[in-house]
Amino acid sequence: MDFSQRTKMVVGESPFEKVTDKKICVVGVGGVGGAALEGLVRFGMKNITIFDFDTVDITNLNRQIISTRDVVGINKTEVAANRAKSINPDINIRTVNVFIEKDNLQLIKDEKPDYVIDAIDSVKAKLDLIEFCHRENIPIISSMGTGNRLNCTGFVIDKVEKTAGNGCGLSKVMRQELKKRGITGHTSLFNTRPPESKAVNSANGRNAPGSCPFAPNVAGLMVAQYVVSQLL
């Protein structure tokens, strides 16, 4: 039996076949990106390329859907691809185990994506990816911060300018820096509510945000749904 049978009942068989042939790039497969990938795979998307340079860490277990104890230390791209294939063995999923930055953004274009999901944390890399996609006319949606939240209500998808006053540090920086680069109206997922706690110094001395399983997974599924809806 076709595992997508019930999905087709929602969107219709012809639109389903059309949209699932599209190519999606997911940049970062951690909390938000991993959940977005999960949604795309379970929906039935057939062609996905995932980018990440990191390995699964024990601290990922509280929120990242791809992480389990038996894959700690393994490349996230490998883990995510294996999970995708366990859901749909016929999926065409490519893995690129790199940190996306200005010098290798051509890798994105080479995939000829119909949509890019930006789920990376590095501000500079995020800015460069967004600028590149806007310049190359590649549709892209970016996730802003999902840390320091227990309550996962308040997530919306709108222009990045609408993040003003939401208390998210990443949103503020992205809003300011994108404006400097002449980019307006960038589609972003963000929360309209302020974070419930502040970043604290972790054991390694970094200013790290707290996290719970709810917000990043809700955010990732919202991003996946938005992309599918835009392509239908």
Model feature map: region roles:
Residues 26-28, 51:
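Conserved N-terminal Rossmann-fold NAD(P)-binding element of oxidoreductases
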Residues 32-33:
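Hydrophobic/small residue at the entry helix of a nucleotide-binding pocket
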Residues 42-47:
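Conserved S-adenosyl-L-methionine
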Residues 50-88:
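Glycine-rich phosphate-binding loop and adjoining beta1-alpha1-beta2 segment
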Residues 97-105:
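Conserved SAM/SAH-binding loop
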